[in-house]
From Swiss-Prot:
Its EC number is 6.3.3.3. Mg(2+) binds at residues 17, 55, 116. HAMAP family: BioD (MF_00336). It comes from Clostridium botulinum (strain Eklund 17B / Type B). Catalyzes a mechanistically unusual reaction, the ATP-dependent insertion of CO2 between the N7 and N8 nitrogen atoms of 7,8-diaminopelargonic acid (DAPA, also called 7,8-diammoniononanoate) to form a ureido ring. GO terms for biological process: biotin biosynthetic process. PANTHER family: ATP-DEPENDENT DETHIOBIOTIN SYNTHETASE BIOD 2, DETHIOBIOTIN SYNTHETASE. It catalyses: (7R,8S)-7,8-diammoniononanoate + CO2 + ATP = (4R,5S)-dethiobiotin + ADP + phosphate + 3 H(+). This is ATP-dependent dethiobiotin synthetase BioD. It is found in: Cytoplasm. InterPro entries: DTB_synth_BioD, P-loop_NTPase.
Length: 227
């Protein structure tokens, strides 16, 4: 039975893919069979007239995963817009059944599976007669969350609001990672302290351009839960 965790963030462009790649890399370098999955990706790359899931490609490259990165993403769209709008523009129906089936397939291939979300926690994945929000996917997959937040000014507000929304949907967050952390920046240092006190969650940091995630392997493994 595989163990899984879901990586989400306070907003888009916070560094989910970067953090996800470092987490998968750390586990794989410890000879742990860790895989990657993403339900929907927009803003894909076009390489030699072929659509490529850029986030997945990045994770594969950093974590040294062999194979076609497109295979670990259920829906891939060229337009750099929210998945629900990309689906509408391409007349594509996003199916929760397909997402769950693809996720389960990845779980059968790996002992640990790291799932990356789209955008921030409040992200519509499909918005037609049927509506799928990112939180609906997390509930279906039944895995805990690691929340990626910025380190600088505004981080406390964005992080606490995101946690409140997650709590409202009866989902579990087991840790926070502050991205682009500068250990000499008094704001970053204070934000980490305040968030630890306000949330009672472990708050880790990742410095800019780091090639490793500063989380002990034993603790990182504990953030994954059985699916």
């Amino acid at each position: 039975m595989a163990k899984g965790v879901f990586i989400t963030a306070t907003n888009t462009d916070i560094g989910k893919t970067y953090i996800t790649a470092l987490i998968v890399k750390k586990l794989r370098e410890a000879n742990i069979n860790c895989g990657y999955y993403k339900a929907a990706l927009s803003g894909a790359e076009i390489i030699n007239n072929n659509i490529v899931a850029g986030d997945a490609k990045y994770v594969y490259n950093v974590a040294n995963i062999k194979g076609n990165p497109n295979e670990c993403v259920s829906y891939i769209f060229k337009q750099a817009v929210s998945p629900h709008l990309a689906a509408k523009l391409n007349n594509v129906h996003i199916s929760m059944d397909k997402i769950v089936a693809d996720f389960n397939y990845r779980c059968n291939e790996h002992d640990y599976i790291t799932v990356e979300g789209s955008g921030g926690i409040i992200c519509p994945i499909y918005y037609d007669k049927e509506k799928i929000m990112l939180t609906d996917i997390i509930k279906k997959l039944k895995i805990p969350i690691i929340l990626v937040s910025p380190s600088g000014l505004g981080s406390i507000n964005g992080t606490i609001l995101t946690l409140e929304y997650i709590k409202k949907h009866n989902l579990v967050v087991n840790s926070i990672i502050l991205n682009n952390y500068d250990k000499s920046n008094i704001i970053h240092i204070d934000n980490k302290r305040i968030l630890e006190e306000m949330t009672n969650l472990p708050v880790y940091t990742c410095e800019q351009y780091s090639e490793d995630i500063d989380i002990p392997l034993k603790e990182l493994k504990q953030f994954y839960d059985f699916i």
